[in-house]
From Swiss-Prot:
Classification of source organism: Bacteria, Bacillati, Cyanobacteriota, Cyanophyceae, Acaryochloridales
UniProt-recorded name of the protein: Methylenetetrahydrofolate--tRNA-(uracil-5-)-methyltransferase TrmFO
SUPFAM superfamilies attached to this UniProt entry: FAD/NAD(P)-binding domain
GO cellular component: cytosol
Primary localization: cytoplasm
Organism of origin: Acaryochloris marina (strain MBIC 11017)
Role, per record: Catalyzes the folate-dependent formation of 5-methyl-uridine at position 54 (M-5-U54) in all tRNAs.
Length: 465
């Protein structure tokens, strides 16, 4: 192995641990850098240990059922030989229909497993700058150190790195009531690009009062300071509390919007149809399956968001794939910077995964680590990188983050709204998700079996675990 330059993985979270394992299992040396050290009292504001793959929030990887987004991703990762999912299965604790783990045992076991691998060198200490040479996988997460963040900032450019996630809810398009919502742009300028949910005065006042009274989630201390310096992150509930009409002069502004189904908006008999306020939704993906509630960045608790936002006419049955959030979250503008292989466009030997690239959730971070690690070792071996089938949950997620509109890019969790449509529509949602699952797992099986080298790599990973 003297002639093999080790691949460097920066960050020992879920993505980094998975990436390092895939590299090592392929027979290539890897240096896994982890900044945290209990002995040296060097931890992040959110971490409590220096173990690899520490779960800092929930101990749950999400729903187990494979006709759910998280569960399908679990199933795909099992096929691909993921060490994270294997250890999650081993250390599972009862949690209803979710895959939850004993987080202490889970992280300790992964740390021991990686440290004992002959191809893995675990280095404790901060990496203050992006390495210039060799193949590198960046998985430093949402709490990347200040020095490395500055190095990444210089590499990506000022406009392509975010430090605070203030995002509006994202809704499944087919759950929006089109009998109420209408397509239009303000003053009919250009293409009808927005779905508009009109409110009369009574509806608006009820919504405003509910929003003012709704319960907020508390920002952590280290997030409060960041929020002070984030331009334009005023939560919709704070805007509501500033006055009854504040939202009507902001994101719920009604001027220039009229439902053409009523006819000419100038006609006197149609004056009664002019909305008092309008909530707008902007298309989030190319296929128009996901819609973003414009200007609704919020710090409300998730249950409150669903209750209050479903008061908006047309959103009574809205299905949320991502709730609004406001928290510290260092992430890059992936559509501008990354290929679906998770390589940086301007430096193909630098790859990234985890929350840093705008995927949300433990399982998505694991999937990103799998792909980035797999492609890193393929590049080191002189092979072409691979992309996962877009019909899979993992493949569709990486296709989405690398092809979304850069201007409005916000992190995305796994969800069925980003998977390509079926050839024939299945009306029942649960049945449709089951068909998505069957197609995804069949396509992934065929994909794994296609290139002989790749088949051997995945088979070796699965067998040796």
């Amino acid at each position: 192995m003297d002639h093999q330059q080790p691949i460097q993985v920066i960050g020992g979270g879920l993505a980094g641990t998975e990436a390092a394992w895939q590299i090592a299992q392929a027979g290539w040396p890897v240096i896994l850098h982890e900044m945290r050290s209990v002995e040296e009292e060097r931890l992040t504001p959110a971490h409590h240990t220096d173990q690899l793959a520490e779960l800092v929030c929930s101990n749950s990887f999400g729903a187990q059922a494979s006709d759910r987004a998280a569960g399908l991703l679990h199933a795909e990762l099992r096929q691909l030989g993921s060490i994270i999912i294997r250890k999650a299965d081993e250390h599972q604790v009862p949690a209803g229909g979710a895959l939850a783990v004993d987080r202490g045992v889970f992280s300790r076991n992964l740390t021991e497993t990686l440290a004992e691998h002959p191809n893995v060198e675990l280095r404790r200490g901060e990496v203050p700058t992006l390495p210039i040479d060799g193949t590198v996988v960046l998985t430093s997460g949402p709490l990347t150190s200040a020095a490395l963040t500055e190095s990444l900032h210089q590499f990506t450019g000022q406009d392509y790195l975010s430090f605070f996630d203030a995002a509006s809810p994202i809704i499944v398009g087919e759950s929006i009531n089109r009998d109420v919502a209408f397509l239009a742009s303000r003053y009919d300028r250009g293409e009808a690009a927005y779905l508009n949910c009109p409110m009369n005065r009574e509806q608006y006042l009820a919504f405003w009062q509910a929003l003012c009274a709704a319960e907020q989630a508390e920002l952590k201390d280290f997030e409060k300071e960041t929020a002070k310096f984030f331009e334009g992150c005023l939560p919709i509930e704070e805007m509501a509390r500033r006055g009854e009409d504040t939202m009507r002069y902001g994101p719920l502004k009604p001027v220039g919007l009229f439902d053409a189904r009523y006819g000419d908006f100038k006609a006197p008999e149609n004056q009664k149809y002019r909305p008092y306020a309008v909530a707008q939704l902007r298309q989030e993906d190319k296929a128009g399956k996901l819609w973003n509630l414009v200007g609704f960045q919020t710090n409300l608790r998730w249950g409150e968001q669903k209750r209050v936002f479903q008061m908006i006419p047309g959103l009574e049955s809205a299905e949320f794939v991502r709730m609004g959030v406001m928290h510290r979250n260092t992430f890059i503008n992936a559509p501008e910077l990354l290929h679906p292989t998770l390589q940086f466009k301007q430096r193909p030997t630098l790859l990234a995964a985890g929350q840093l690239i705008g995927t949300e959730g433990y399982t998505a971070a694991t999937a990103g680590g799998w792909l980035a690690g797999t492609n890193a070792v393929r590049l080191a071996q002189g092979l072409n990188p691979v992309v996962l089938p877009t019909t899979t949950m993992s493949g569709s997620l990486f296709e989405f983050i690398s092809s979304a509109t850069p201007k409005h890019f916000q992190p995305m969790p796994p969800n069925f709204g980003i998977i390509p449509d079926l050839p024939q529509r299945v009306r029942n949602k649960r049945e449709r998700y089951g068909v998505y699952r069957d197609r995804a797992l069949a396509d992934l099986t065929a994909w794994i079996a296609e290139p002989s080298l790749f088949r051997q790599t995945v088979a070796a990973n699965s067998a040796s675990m």
